[in-house]
Amino acid sequence: VNEVARTVIVRSTPLPRKLFRVFVELEGMYRNMVEQLVLYAVRTGVISFTRLKALKYRELRSQYPQLPSHYAYTTCQDASTRAKSFLRVKKEGLAKRGYPEVNRVSIWLDDHLWRMKSLTSIEIATHKGWVVIELELHKLFWKYMNSEWRVASEAKIKLNKWERRLVIYLVFKKIVEAYRPRGFISVDVNENHAAVLVDGKAYLFKTDFRDIILGYYYRRKRIQEKYDKFYGASCRVKKKVLEGLKERERKSNLKWKLANIVVRIAVDKQYTIVLERLGKNPAKEMVNHFRDDQLRYRIYQASFKGVQRAVEEKAREHGVPVVYADPRNTSRMCPIHSSLIVYENDSRVGRCSRGGELWHRDVVACYNLLLRARLGNGSNAPSLGGLKVDGSPVPLGSTATYEPTEISRSLWARWKSLDATNKNKSMRISI
């Protein structure tokens, strides 16, 4: 049994100037408290929330007696998190300065500082008393509110001074129970596609990350050349135009849709998801073998870890078990003979050097991940006896294990189930 948390961002209705000024004053006092606590925590090494609260609570209460007392608690939590993050970055040699800076502030609230007044409004405790804030709600909020999710006691608010609004970060939680898996789904993520092996059938989801990355790369380059020529390198207009590009949103949308498809299959079949055991920064390890600047840039932007993280988050939300297998040589070794697969002329289809079988490199990677998961994770999933691998060396043999079913991005990105993404009925599987 695990508890899963998700954050939903909602905005308030535009606030009157007098009411918004109350939150501007509250933010100023909150910022001063956090700055004071962060500098103290880094200087003295006291980064524990409990210890920091014990040492600084009375001082904060004497400095800001007009604030509700629990703001002293939440500022200590905020400062403790910031101090730990700064010291970790400083230890890795990535800190730009020797002391932390508080640039952006989100006001942390606990159950004594805010509450739901109704389904469309909340109340926030300030130095002027309790204030009612009306919310502009959207589809995602109602999706969580009308399901098994419950609103957590903690929340955050941020000020949008251009529109005189509050941005509220609501946390929803629910309890999920993991099931006893009856099989495996192996997933192999690459730069331009992701391969998924389900019940002996391989599906190749075309993500087109390479085209998206290069398209935005050349677009940014043209924008920079155009505005640098007339306005200079640090012009505000160019920055605003570049901020309007939606590369991150497009890639994030594809990641979550792909993760949703994989997890829905696993839930319906009660399977475990098998992923590659990647390092902390797999792209950095991969680019060490390449000198082409454009290829290195593409690998950095391909988000191998990001796709895995999306699958992990979705799996945690639905209680799907996830296991990891060593990805070393998964696309080079034949799963039948444990011998090398020879690829010629940069082809994605290779031949086993011992048995002569033809293998697609993404399909064989999924099979090897599946084999390693079944041999090494000790789960309740079926043993190797149920694994069906076509050993026929004849091209396009009876089951054609080397040839995956390719699904273009225009098909699967519209839907949320694998069955709906298959164009032909003959390719469909029963989910």
Task: Please identify what each model-predicted range represents.
Residues V34, A41, A83, L87-K90, ...:
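A generic secondary-structure signal for well-formed alpha-helical elements
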Residues V1-S80, K96, S430:
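Gly/serine-rich nucleotide phosphate-binding loop at the start of the catalytic core
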Residues A41-T44, A54, K90-N103, I223-K239:
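Flexible coil/linker segments and helix-coil junctions enriched in charged and small residues
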Residues E3-I9, L166-I431:
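Positively charged, helix-rich recognition surfaces that bind polyanionic ligands
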Residues M33, L37, Y71-L87, V363-N377:
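Stable alpha-helical structural segments in soluble proteins, enriched in small hydrophobic residues
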Residues L52-W162, T207, Q301:
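Acidic carboxylate diad motif detector
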Residues Y30, T75-A83, V241-E247, Q308:
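Short amphipathic alpha-helical coiled-coil/interface segments
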Residues R6-R17, G129-L137, Y203-T207:
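Generic detection of short hydrophobic beta-strand segments and adjacent strand-loop junctions
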